[in-house]
Amino acid sequence: MELGVSSQLWLWLLLLLLPPVPGREKESGSKWKVFIDQINRALENYEPCSSPNCSCYHGVIEEDLTPFRGGISRKMMAEVVRRKLGTHYQIIKNRLYRESDCMFPSRCSGVEHFILEVIGRLPDMEMVINVRDYPQVPKWMEPAIPIFSFSKTLEYHDIMYPAWTFWEGGPAVWPIYPMGLGRWDLFREDLVRSAAQWPWKKKNSTAYFRGSRTSPERDPLILLSRKNPKLVDAEYTKNQAWKSMKDTLGKPAAKDVHLVDHCKYKYLFNFRGVAASFRFKHLFLCGSLVFHVGDEWLEFFYPQLKPWVHYIPVKTDLSNVQELLQFVKANDDVAQEIAERGSQFILNHLKMDDITCYWENLLTEYSKFLSYNVTRRKGYDQIVPKILKIEL
């Protein structure tokens, strides 16, 4: 016997009111709702930088210089120089001068390259540039003193500058990078070529990490890899401080792997080292999805990279890492979109011109707070440009 129209309507209403059968919900709508909602909120609140130059980062310069708006006196600068917290530089009549001491000559050389690129447009000034890994001006220090450092946490007043590694002086990795990481312009080209060879659909879906044990925060991922190698391929390599297998958690050190070969993998992990990790910017250019562990350590460009928009944020203790990996595997299109946004940001807003631009803007703004005329110190040598290297 056929049902009447009214009976059919009641039947449909009854079906709509019944609870769903367990296990039949769409994963993106239920199991992964928390992550999907976080991504949607992040995108709603995100304002892309459309500027063609480094003005995307101007807010970082303003914030870093805020403690010194009362002025930097000759007496304050003399005290900063005396304390040997960094290398003392002077710019006078568009020439660069430096004290003879530099703890890491290749790092100083990387810094000097960028200053010399823009020195013709800079006013007279002097500054102390820290080329150690660690920042020097904790916020409890009174008064705050002007020290330039490449990386810091929110607990420091150091003024961030683009690291020397954009040109030279990065950590040496034998045998693949014996001269150290550098030449960001050339690295960009190599990574873009590798990314083209490994489009998203061809990439290995095992999460990947290779690096030395510069921080024990990396340990949980290494241990997870040993437990579940299909989910994560993570191993420790040697560094200059390596003494025994204790430094690689009881296993032989793995071979170092070129950054371009990381592009074979969909999911790449970034950890802090002693301070911020130099690999971070490189990983994005693989077109892979970056898993960024912790949010404490910063470089000047980090604030413009947003969690869930450009990368996947991971808790410092990695307690949520397995769930996050399961999420991206179950939501491949979402993962690819985040990877593409991260890659495009670095391609568009972290070019070599942006680095040079940031140096010029930073030093120009900083010079406005010096309340005295700079005079050249005796015994300081003039720094002149070096011959350009054209390949890695």
Swiss-Prot record:
Where does the source fall among the domains of life? Eukaryota
**Signal sequence annotation:** 1-23
| Recorded metabolic or biological pathway in which this protein acts | Protein modification; protein glycosylation
Q: Where is this region: Interaction with the consensus sequence C-X-S-X-[PA]-C in peptide substrates?
A: 103-107, 172-178
Enzyme Commission designation: 2.4.1.376, 2.4.2.63
Q: Name one GO cellular component term.
A: endoplasmic reticulum lumen
Which top EC class is named for this enzyme in its record? transferase
Q: Where in the cell is the protein located? A: Endoplasmic reticulum lumen
Identify the catalytic residues.
Answer: D133 (proton donor/acceptor)
Q: Which cysteines are joined by disulfide bonds?
A: C49-C56, C54-C357, C102-C108, C263-C286
Name the chain's protein. Answer: Protein O-glucosyltransferase 1
**Species this protein is from:** Bos taurus (Bovine)
